[in-house]
């Protein structure tokens, strides 16, 4: 796990956005397993990454369809495990329709913290080689943040994890 810590506007997001090639470097290189990302097909690069942006994104559909986005062949058990790691399973299970609960476009019918946890679970369900969390824990309360980081550490030992944050927690 690598943490990129700094104040607002210090370039943390710009730095990690070079990995999925949202921007290309103007000099030097960004390498994944020794290969310059500019030499990789975007599809291949994206398949290796799980990215959770600062502003969590949810799509109209259900909780289940949102968690499967990018990993449609995930088993029910894998989806449930990802939700558990992301500390989302408790609030999902409290909903009447559970994983079949409808999600409005943009996730307007869930709280900010729930939206972040669902976005995190979606990235985890993909089982990528590299997980990037770009200030993705900011809407979480302290207790949830601690539990999520602990579960993440235990479950993603073989994954390169990059966490962008404004403060150490």
Which positions does each model-derived feature cover?
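ABC-type nucleotide-binding domain
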Residues: 1-169
């Amino acid at each position: 796990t690598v943490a990129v810590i700094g104040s607002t506007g210090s370039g943390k997001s710009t730095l990690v956005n070079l990995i999925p090639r949202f921007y290309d470097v103007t000099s030097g290189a960004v390498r994944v397993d020794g290969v310059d990302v500019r030499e990789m097909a975007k599809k291949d690069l994206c398949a290796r990454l799980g990215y959770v942006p600062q502003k969590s994104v949810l799509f109209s559909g259900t909780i289940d369809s949102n968690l499967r986005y990018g990993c449609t062949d995930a088993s029910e058990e894998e989806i449930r495990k990802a939700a558990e790691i992301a500390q989302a399973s408790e609030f999902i299970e409290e909903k009447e329709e559970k994983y079949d609960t409808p999600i409005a476009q943009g996730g307007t019918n869930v709280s900010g913290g729930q939206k972040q946890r669902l976005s995190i679970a979606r990235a985890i369900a993909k089982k990528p080689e590299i997980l990037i969390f770009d200030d993705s824990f900011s809407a979480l309360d302290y207790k949830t943040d601690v539990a999520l980081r602990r579960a993440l550490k235990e479950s993603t030992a073989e994954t390169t994890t990059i966490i962008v944050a404004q403060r150490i927690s």
